[in-house]
Design a protein with these regions (language model features):
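Helix-loop-beta element that forms the nucleotide-linked donor phosphate-binding surface
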Residues: 122-136
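Extended catalytic core of nucleotide-activated donor transferases of GT-like folds
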Residues: 13-126
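Short polar catalytic/cofactor-binding loops
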Residues: 8-11
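Extreme N-terminal starter segment of soluble prokaryotic enzymes
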Residues: 1-4
Length: 136
């Protein structure tokens, strides 16, 4: 598996991404960073790194899924969707801050993970059609 992560958008979330990258690499997975300090070059590198259906974006709080123009291609779809990259979105903040994106997910195959059990319960109550992990 190949994993794309994002850094330098939000300091703490970049740190979390770096820690995840280390673990993914220890597990034998290839990793690639989209760097907000060098967006043009690192976004260009996605197409060279990604293998359709074998690559995932692992992001936090909809970074890279919030309508950023750099990730939207000419056909109006996200690069993730066009390149067959699955999206794992880890919500660190409460889901209520992302109502518009949860009500109408930016990509069809997005998996949402919450770090708080109360957030999972909230998701199941207000967005029952959207799969959320962990599923307690």
């Amino acid at each position: 598996m190949k994993v794309i992560l994002i850094k330098n958008a939000v300091e703490t979330l970049g740190y979390f991404s770096e820690q995840l990258a280390e673990t993914f690499q220890e597990m034998g997975h290839d990793t690639y960073f989209v760097d907000y300090d060098d967006l043009v070059n690192t976004v260009d590198g996605i197409s060279r790194f990604a293998v359709p259906e074998k690559t995932v974006l692992c992001t936090f709080n909809f970074i890279g899924l919030s309508g950023e123009e750099v990730f939207i291609e000419e056909n109006g779809r996200y690069i993730w969707e066009n390149q067959g990259i699955a999206c794992i979105n880890i919500l660190v903040d409460h889901p209520l801050y992302y109502h518009s994106k949860l009500a109408k997910p930016p990509v069809p195959e997005m998996r949402v993970f919450c770090i708080d059990r109360e957030h999972v319960a909230y998701m199941k109550r207000f967005y029952p059609a959207l799969p959320v992990q962990p599923d307690h």
